[in-house]
C-alpha cells in the first residue's frame, strides 16, 4: 500500500479532547507470555451497572422516531482527494435535542448536558463518547478508501465500523454501493457506537441524506417531502424526513440488497459475540475504526476486539485503525497500540500482520493496516 496525505492543521478544527476522568476505572491487564490475567474483553469493569451493554438497535424503530424531523446538513469534501461527503449540522442536532427535552423529561440528563454542549467536555467515559462530532482521522480513512474504492466495494460483503459516530467512511462506501445500482449487492453495514442517541441523531440521518442526494431526482426530492401538501418548503440544504421519504429509503435499501445493522453499547465479550453473529455469513469484511484508542484504558480492549474478529476462520478481515500519534492530555498513542498488537500477534503466533502508515500532516496522525491471511485487495 502506498499513499501520501498532505493535510495541514488548517484543514480541521483540531480540538483537544476534554475528558472527564473516571477514577473508578479498573486498569485492564495485558496478557503477557506467562500472564494468567483474563482477556481484556472479559474484564469485570465492562459489565458494571454504569456501563451501557451492547445491543442491536431496531432500524425500523429508529426510522419511525425520525419521522417529520427536518435535517439541516452540510456538503463538503475530504481534504486530500476531495471526495464528496455529507453530514448533519451539529447545531441542527442540538436543536432537535432541545425540542425533545421540552416534550420528554425522561432523557438522561447527564448525557444530554454533554450533547448540548452545556459542559466543557468533548466526551465522558461511559456516558458519551464524542460521536456527534466528525473527528480528523475519519477523513483520513475516507481518503485512504477512495484510493481503492472500485476494488474495495466489489470485494467485500460487510463493512464494520467500530465507534462510528457520524460514520463518514461508511457513508462514503454506502454511496459507492448506491452508485452501482445493483440489486445483487449483498452488502452489510454494521455500524456501532457507544451511544444509541448518536446512531439516531447523526449516523442514520447521514446515511438517509446521502441516499436522497445520490438516488433521488429533483422531482422525487421534492415530492417525497411534500406528499400531498404543496405548502411544505423544500430546500437543497435541508431534508424533511416525511413518512413517504423514510419508507422510500427503507424499501430502496432493501431492494438493493444492502443491510444496515446498528449496535449500541460498550465493547467487550458481549459486543464481540454480537458481531460474530451478525458476520456469520460474511466472507470478506472491511473493519474501520478511528479515534478509538485515545485512552490507555481503551487501548487493550479495542486491540483485543480487532484480534478476536480476525480470529474467525471462515472470514477474511482487513482492518484500518486511524488515530493521532499521541493524544495529549489523555494518554493514548498509536505506538502503544501498535506495540500491544504486535506483542499479541507474536506471542500467540497469530496469522495476522500489521503495518503502520504515516499521514503527511502537521497534526501527526497514522493509519495501521491489519490483515488476516491474504490481502483482499
Indicate where each model-derived feature is located:
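S-adenosylmethionine-dependent methyltransferases
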Residues: 1-377
Amino acid at each position: 500500500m502506498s499513499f501520501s496525505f498532505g493535510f495541514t492543521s488548517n484543514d480541521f478544527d483540531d480540538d483537544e479532547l476534554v475528558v472527564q476522568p473516571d477514577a473508578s476505572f479498573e486498569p485492564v491487564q495485558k496478557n503477557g507470555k506467562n500472564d494468567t490475567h483474563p482477556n481484556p474483553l472479559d474484564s469485570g469493569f465492562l459489565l458494571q451497572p454504569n456501563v451501557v451493554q451492547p445491543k442491536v438497535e431496531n432500524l425500523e424503530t429508529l426510522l419511525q422516531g425520525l419521522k417529520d424531523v427536518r435535517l439541516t446538513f452540510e456538503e463538503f469534501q475530504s481534504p486530500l482527494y476531495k471526495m464528496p461527503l455529507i453530514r448533519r449540522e451539529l447545531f441542527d442536532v442540538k436543536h432537535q435535542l432541545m425540542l425533545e427535552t421540552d416534550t420528554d423529561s425522561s432523557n438522561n440528563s447527564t448525557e444530554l448536558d454533554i450533547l448540548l454542549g452545556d459542559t466543557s467536555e468533548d466526551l465522558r467515559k461511559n456516558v458519551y463518547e464524542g460521536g456527534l462530532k466528525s473527528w480528523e482521522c475519519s477523513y483520513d480513512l475516507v481518503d485512504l478508501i477512495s484510493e481503492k474504492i472500485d476494488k474495495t466495494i466489489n470485494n467485500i460483503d460487510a463493512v464494520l465500523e467500530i465507534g462510528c459516530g457520524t460514520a463518514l467512511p461508511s457513508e462514503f462506501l454506502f454511496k459507492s454501493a448506491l452508485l452501482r445500482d445493483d440489486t445483487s449487492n449483498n452488502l452489510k453495514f454494521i455500524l456501532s457506537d457507544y451511544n444509541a442517541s448518536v446512531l439516531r441523531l447523526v449516523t442514520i440521518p447521514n446515511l438517509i441524506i446521502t441516499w436522497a442526494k445520490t438516488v433521488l431526482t429533483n422531482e422525487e426530492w421534492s415530492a417525497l417531502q411534500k406528499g400531498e401538501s404543496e405548502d411544505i418548503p423544500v430546500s437543497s440544504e435541508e431534508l424533511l424526513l416525511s413518512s413517504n421519504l423514510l419508507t422510500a429509503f427503507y424499501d430502496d435499501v432493501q431492494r438493493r440488497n444492502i443491510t444496515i445493522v446498528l449496535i449500541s453499547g460498550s465493547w467487550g465479550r458481549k459486543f464481540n459475540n454480537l458481531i460474530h453473529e451478525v458476520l456469520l455469513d460474511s466472507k470478506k469484511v472491511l473493519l474501520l475504526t478511528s479515534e478509538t484508542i485515545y485512552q490507555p484504558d481503551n487501548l487493550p480492549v479495542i486491540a483485543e476486539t480487532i484480534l478476536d474478529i480476525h480470529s474467525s476462520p471462515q472470514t477474511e478481515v482487513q482492518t484500518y485503525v486511524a488515530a493521532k500519534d499521541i493524544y495529549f492530555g489523555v494518554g493514548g498513542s498509536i505506538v502503544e497500540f501498535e506495540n500491544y498488537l504486535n506483542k499479541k500477534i507474536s506471542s500467540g503466533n497469530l496469522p495476522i500482520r500489521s503495518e503502520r502508515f504515516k499521514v503527511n500532516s502537521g497534526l501527526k496522525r497514522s493509519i495501521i493496516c491489519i490483515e488476516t491471511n491474504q490481502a483482499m485487495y
